[in-house]
UniProtKB/Swiss-Prot annotation:
The lineage of its organism: Bacteria, Bacillati, Bacillota, Clostridia, Eubacteriales. It comes from Clostridium perfringens (strain 13 / Type A). It comes from the Bacteria. This is Uncharacterized protein CPE0190.
Length: 129
């Protein structure tokens, strides 16, 4: 697939996901009972599970063409996001202490957010060769 076609496909997939999310939230808010609604929400759930897999595949195909310097730059960016999100968690815990919030719960969420942000940056950024 050409780069322009992939970007168009990305735009369609992300727009469809945002649209389906809004419709699903509206359906849940209004509590609309119907078989068609159940089918739509089920399709949305399956779509929401498949999107991270699509993004992961896109990241792997994109990173395959990176030079060592670009990989190092993205690794540093990932570490900075991870440290920043972890610090925000710690400051938030200091300002608003919660009894069940532990470091073991902060690490996976910080790691996941940093990984997600870095993956979206890799997929959505326009690289010049």
């Amino acid at each position: 697939m050409k780069k322009g076609n992939v970007r168009t496909l990305d735009g369609i997939i992300y727009s469809l996901f945002i649209f389906m999310t809004i419709v699903t939230l509206f359906i849940i808010y209004r509590d609309i009972p119907s078989n068609a609604v159940l089918n739509f929400v089920t399709a949305y759930a399956i779509f929401a599970i498949l999107i991270p897999l699509y993004i992961l595949v896109r990241v792997l195909f994109t990173v395959k063409h990176f030079t060592f310097e670009e990989v190092k730059k993205e690794g540093v960016k990932f570490l900075m996001f991870f440290i920043g999100i972890m610090m925000l968690n710690l400051v938030g815990d200091f300002l608003l202490p919660l009894p069940d919030l532990k470091l073991s719960k902060m690490l996976p969420s910080s790691l996941g957010f940093a990984f997600g942000i870095t993956c979206f940056d890799i997929v959505l950024s326009k690289r010049t060769k």
